[in-house]
C-alpha cells in the first residue's frame, strides 16, 4: 500500500483535484471530506468516493 501524506486533510468542499492514477477522469470538485473519505465529482467520470488513506488526490490551484 502506498504511503499517503496528510495533504488530503486540507481538501475542502469546492476545491479542485485530480486523481493521480486516472488522469482521464479530468478535473474533480471536492463535495465532502469526512473521516478521510473524500467525495469528488469528476468532470469525465462523475461522483466517486475516494479513501484518503489509500489515494493522495492532487490539488489543482490553477485549472
Model-predicted regions and their roles:
Residues 26-32:
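Short beta-strand-centered aromatic/proline hotspots
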Residues 1-3, 47-63:
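Intrinsically disordered, low-complexity, charged/polar segments
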Residues 1-16, 24:
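Mixed-charge, Lys/Arg-rich low-complexity intrinsically disordered regions
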Residues 38-42:
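SH3/SH3-like beta-barrel fold
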Residues 33, 43:
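Short, loop-centered acidic/histidine patches that primarily coordinate divalent metals
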